Structures are given as C-alpha cells and as structure tokens.
Amino acid sequence: MGEDMRVVKVESKWPPIIVMVISQVAMGSVNALVKKALDVGVNHMIIGAYRIAISSFILAPIAYILEREIIPEITFRLMVDHFISGLLGASLMQFFYLLGLSYTSATVACALVSLMPAITFAFALILRTEKIKSLRTQAGMIKVMGTIICISGALFLTFYKGPHISNSHSHQEALPHNNNSDHNTKNWLLGCLYLTIGTVLISLWILFQGTLSIKYPCKFSSTCLMSIFAAFQCALLSLYKSRDVKDWIIDDRFVIGVIVYAGVIGQAMSTVSVTWGVKKLGAVFVSAIMPIALISASLFDFIILHTPLYLGSLIGSVGTITGLYVFLWGKNKDMEA
C-alpha cells in the first residue's frame, strides 16, 4: 500500500515537470524572437502592452469556465494587490527587461534571470525571513557560495563581451564594428543593468505572489486580473519613448506574429505554468528548471535566427548556471535538515 502511494506521488509530479520544461523551452524562443522584433525599432512597451493584453484576452474565458464557481469576493484590497502584482511582475519588469533585451541578447537576458533565486535569497536576508544564524551551517555556507558564483558569472558576462562566435549564416549587421565599439560597449553595460533591475523586480514579484496566492488561490483569474492592470500600465509607460498614436499601428507581419506568440505562450501560458509549478513542485524545483530557457534561447538565437554569440556571454552563462545549482543544492540540504 505504501509503495503504491509512493508510485502515485512520483507519477503525479511528472505532468508539472513536463509542462515546466516545455514552458521554459518556449520562453527561450520567445526571448529570441522578441529581441528580433525589438531590432526592427518597435517601442518596447508597445510590444509589452499588446503582449499582456493578448494574455488577458486568452485567460479571461479560461478563468470564467474553470473558476467561475470558486472565485473569492474581489475586495478593494485584492484589487490593489493585483495592481501591485501587475506592476512588479509585468509592466515595470517588462519596461526594464525588454529595454535591456534590446541592448543585449536573448542569451544574456535568460542568463541574468537565472540570478533570481540568489537575489530572492539576498532579499530574504535583508527582510529577515532568512535567519543569519543559518548561514553558519553547511547548507547556509553552500547557499552563500552559490550566490557568489552566480553574481560572479553575471558580472563576467556584463563586463566581458569577448569575441563573437558566428556560424556561416550569421547576419553581418549583427556583428560588431570597430568604429562604434565604445557605443556598443556602453549599450551592452546599460542593457545588463536594465536586465538586472528586471530580474530584481521578478524576485520581488515572486515574494509578493506567495502572499497573494494564499489570499486569492485562483491562478487563471488572478493572472488575468494582473494582466488587465499591467496592460494599462504598459500603455502609460510607453509614453516614455513615444507619444505618437501611429506607433501603435504595427504592419510588420513578423512583429505581429511575435507579439501574438509572446502573448499566448510567453505571458499567459508561461505565467500560469510557473504558478502551477511552484504550487505542485515548490519554488526550488521550478528554479532548477528555469536554465532550460537559457539553453533554448542560445540554440534558437544561433541556429535558427543566425545571431552571433559572444564568448563572454557563454562563459558568464555557464558560471551563472553553476552558481544557481550550487545554491539550489544548499537550499535542498537546508530543507532536509
């Protein structure tokens, strides 16, 4: 009887694992495609607004069908919480993340997102939810070591771009030119800074979402409500770059396709799958799967979009992922203690 229960428990974990893996592979392709769309010159927050609006349209009927009988009463406090959730996890995060992506690459963007567990750990120390005393244990020391390796990898890919690695089909316009190398370096550093700010906002969103999901456990309607607020927030943030209404009229078929794909897969399905994954597998396990997006983005960038990669990005990404898994190893030992 006990053995049967263990088999059922193991088998019940496979669906969320498979969904998370597929989700992260898709996220890697989303980042690579959005980067290509940004290179066309579209306002990054207009892409963000359309992407999130599509997400809310997709999720609204799903939420109504699956959750209409269990949705809790929506109070003013819950509305404010979803407004903040939209700000941290969607609009403000995308403002910095997409701006950073436009200056760097999908590989760098996914690598810096791998810093998320380490940043969350640092916030936990600052907010005293992680006890300082626990740092003296073996698990605590491993977590600190993993955090340091993570940050070192991120710093390496930020400050060392290195020579490009291209294949025979790499686009020549994407390759660096000596006459504007200083400008490229400045943009690269700015891009990494913006991506780091975006990752910090995602970390804060995850901490905030942990509390919100207890008060409002309906994942589809919660994500939909968050997306509605975030779409309006993105529209306001788009004024930072342009106030011309014509910029909202997109006639490039590739960009339209990317926005739809990013809205359905990268925003709606990805947010729901991560929320479900955290609930079923735990935040640590979900964090361990997230580097798959980095591998997916790199392969999609290099093989399909023929974008050159940089040595610094590859070495820094390996360092960041190594640090992530060292950190997760320490976290696992901490949970077992």
Curated annotation (Swiss-Prot):
The chain crosses the membrane at residues 14-34, 46-66, 83-103, 107-127, 139-159, 188-208, 220-240, 254-274, 284-304, 309-329. Residues 27-157, 220-328 form the EamA domain. One of its GO terms (cellular component) is membrane. Pfam families: EamA. GO terms for molecular function: transmembrane transporter activity. Keywords: Membrane, Repeat, Transmembrane, Transmembrane helix. It comes from the Eukaryota. It is found in: Membrane. It is a multi-pass membrane protein. Belongs to the drug/metabolite transporter (DMT) superfamily. Plant drug/metabolite exporter (P-DME) (TC 2.A.7.4) family. This is WAT1-related protein At1g11460. It comes from Arabidopsis thaliana (Mouse-ear cress). The lineage of its organism: Eukaryota, Viridiplantae, Streptophyta, Embryophyta, Tracheophyta.
